[in-house]
């Protein structure tokens, strides 16, 4: 709110200078900062230098010890620096993460084309198939279907052919009790 009415470059330089204070911030301030940076990027064109400053500051520490910070920072870094961030997120997904975290990351990875190897795409679609078998809220099946549709649309015909078995495989659902 305090930034309204200030010059665009003042906003950016003031906000970006906070990157040096990142480690000193309490988590609530880190979340506020991430949100402000995300809004700045979505509403204004920022220079390549400013993007690099954000990537350098937030990306060098990713993944963080905090799941919540990871979930807030990952979408921003996937957008700004997919070639470095996507492999880190895929590795994170291979580890022990909750269903909520996994679906969150799959959602944000769905449209990325940079930073994804054929192997990482296999991992992505295997995890997506796994989550498609889990019980969830009413909208979960539709959300996962949309993630599958959008992520499949990013594949080239060659990749679709190479991933044919992974794309077609769906783990069997457990039997419902009588």
Predicted regions mapped to residue ranges:
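Long, ordered, helix-rich scaffold segments
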Residues: 1-178
